Regions:
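Basic, Lys/Arg-enriched alpha-helical interface segments
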Residues: 2-60
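Short, Lys/Arg-enriched, disordered terminal segments
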Residues: 1-4, 95-97
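Enriched for short, Lys/Arg-rich terminal
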Residues: 66-70, 74-97
Length: 97
């Protein structure tokens, strides 16, 4: 059985903010659509290979960098939970994981 993908409200909001930023910055959604596809494809790979990410601070949380974004997640045999998507160009002191 395939793992279920669960997005925390914070992670989903992170994704929307990132995509909106690029829509507004560029003036169209070409780049944001491509970025969204990249992120979703990567998450599909995490379902198959959940240990790809590096363990975060001796917790069950893992982190994987994709382009300029850190994707924080945890997993069990039944689900993959996306916890946060962080733009690495932002101030790391604001990271709430």
């Amino acid at each position: 059985m395939a793992k279920q993908i669960i997005w925390t409200p914070e992670a989903f909001e992170d994704l929307i903010e990132i995509l909106d930023y690029w829509d507004n910055r560029i003036g169209n959604n070409y780049y944001s659509d491509k970025l969204e596809q990249t992120i979703y494809s990567f998450i599909d790979n995490l379902i198959i290979f959940p240990d790809m990410g590096k363990r975060y601070k001796d917790t069950d949380i893992r982190c994987f960098v994709k382009e300029n974004y850190e994707i924080y997640y945890s997993y069990t045999s039944e689900e993959l939970e996306i916890l946060q998507i962080w733009d690495t160009r932002r101030n790391p002191e604001n990271l709430i994981i």
